[in-house]
Amino acid sequence: MKIYTQRLEDISPDQAFETVELTFDTRQKSRFRAALASGVDIGADLPRTGILRSGSYIATQEGDVLRVDAKPERLMKVTAQTEFDLLKAAYHLGNRHVPLMLTPTALYFEPDHVLAEMVEGLGLAVTETDHPFEPESGAYAQHSHDHRLSPIKALHHVHS
């Protein structure tokens, strides 16, 4: 089984690669097993540097390259009569720290009947659908929780 251990920023236009579709849950993990469309099993043991976004590339030590695509999965789709109503739903779902995919005409989140009922209570339509899930990364996606000042930052830290 090929084991993919490196994340690639990009690849050259002539680079050969295979593709794999993964759910959002799997793309959040640094270690996983999956199967290519051909049925070939692969594994990943990647650095913990964040989510694999659809279109990301990973590689083996031997140089084999794999493009990761978002796999269609069961989601709740929120639609509204007005853009403002859709904005209100995004606000309320965001307050619950729900992974949320935004499009100009709809919001998508992982199935949760309590959240669906809340959104329907706001007067919006909620339907189940199969769709690739690429939620927003959020303002704190790469945020460290160490709020101490480093010695370098401390030299420039000014209170006004």
Curated annotation (Swiss-Prot):
Q: Could you state one GO biological process linked to this protein?
A: protein-containing complex assembly
| SMART domains cross-referenced by the UniProt entry | UreE_N
- Where is the protein localized? Cytoplasm
Q: Which InterPro entries match?
A: UreE (IPR012406), UreE_C_dom (IPR007864), UreE_N (IPR004029), UreE_N_sf (IPR036118)
Stored SUPFAM superfamilies: Urease metallochaperone UreE, C-terminal domain, Urease metallochaperone UreE, N-terminal domain
Q: Which GO terms of the molecular function aspect are on file? A: nickel cation binding; unfolded protein binding
The protein's UniProt keywords, in alphabetical order, are: Chaperone, Cytoplasm, Nickel
CC terms in the record's Gene Ontology section: cytoplasm
Function field = Involved in urease metallocenter assembly. Binds nickel. Probably functions as a nickel donor during metallocenter assembly.
The UniProt entry's sequence similarity note says: Belongs to the UreE family.
Q: What is this protein called?
A: Urease accessory protein UreE
Species, as recorded? Acinetobacter baumannii (strain ATCC 17978 / DSM 105126 / CIP 53.77 / LMG 1025 / NCDC KC755 / 5377)
What does the organism's lineage look like at the top?
Bacteria, Pseudomonadati, Pseudomonadota, Gammaproteobacteria, Moraxellales
Task: Provide the gene name from the record.
Answer: ureE
